[in-house]
Swiss-Prot record:
Compartments it resides in: Secreted; Secreted, Extracellular space, Extracellular matrix; Secreted, Extracellular space, Surface film
MF terms in GO: carbohydrate binding; metal ion binding
Source organism (scientific name): Sus scrofa
Gene Ontology CC terms, in alphabetical order: collagen trimer; extracellular space; multivesicular body
Name of the protein in its database record: Pulmonary surfactant-associated protein A
Disulfide bonding pattern of the chain: C155-C247, C225-C239
UniProt KW keywords: Calcium, Collagen, Disulfide bond, Extracellular matrix, Gaseous exchange, Glycoprotein, Hydroxylation, Lectin, Metal-binding, Repeat, Secreted, Signal, Surface film
GO biological process per UniProt: respiratory gaseous exchange by respiratory system
Family named by the database record: Belongs to the SFTPA family.
Other remarks on this protein: Pulmonary surfactant consists of 90% lipid and 10% protein. There are 4 surfactant-associated proteins: 2 collagenous, carbohydrate-binding glycoproteins (SP-A and SP-D) and 2 small hydrophobic proteins (SP-B and SP-C).
Domain C-type lectin: 133-249
Domain Collagen-like: 28-100
Purpose of the protein: In presence of calcium ions, it binds to surfactant phospholipids and contributes to lower the surface tension at the air-liquid interface in the alveoli of the mammalian lung and is essential for normal respiration. Enhances the expression of MYO18A/SP-R210 on alveolar macrophages.
Residues holding Ca(2+): E216, R218, N235, D236
Amino acid sequence: MLRWPLALTFLLLAVSGLECDVKEVCLASPGIPGTPGSHGLPGRDGRDGIKGDPGPPGPMGPPGGMAGPPGQDGMIGAPGLPGERGEKGEPGERGPPGLPAHLDEELQSALHEIRHQILQSMGVLSFQEFMLAVGEKVFSTNGQSVAFWMSLESCVPEQVGRIAAPRSPEENEAIASIVKKHNTYAYLGLVEGPTAGDFFYLDGTPVNYTNWYPGEPRGRGKEKCVEMYTDGQWNDRNCQQYRLAICEF
């Protein structure tokens, strides 16, 4: 009778132990907390953290020692306001005597140029019925028709003008516009040389620009002067005909 209850007791204990192992939870109640342990040894230093943001600027430090070298020159500033007019200075020393007017070449040259311009203006004004400027030249006419030699004389008062002689297409077009306006022919400042067909300006230089009518010149030395048609083309002609006088200045 005593052996059965003892065997039953062992069986219950075995079953109770099996239940505790499977659930890993003991059914016993928690015990009373123990006393805190003593402080352990200090741990090792941790790894460096990420770089933080820059801090605010610190206060200005005291002045340094010796001054540094001067810096480079800056840019030129804007001009300032005009200053007040200064007082009149003392007269300078008297200069050396100048040359008499008739011996001063520069003065004589200037006076000659002024005289030339005055006479040239007078010549242009005497032909002021029609004037046309091309480059540095002025072409003018008084509308009168005369023989070549009379035209030559009327264009050269005091040697400031001459009979118009085109030396470029632009000048030829300008003279042609005057001829067309008056609806007549005009003499040009050209003459035939000793050799038939060779023409020269009145200063003796060979002609470097021409605008002959087709087939001209064909006077074969008998027509020494040159006339311009209303279309601007040229023809050789004897010098006794009456043609429009056009001058250039």
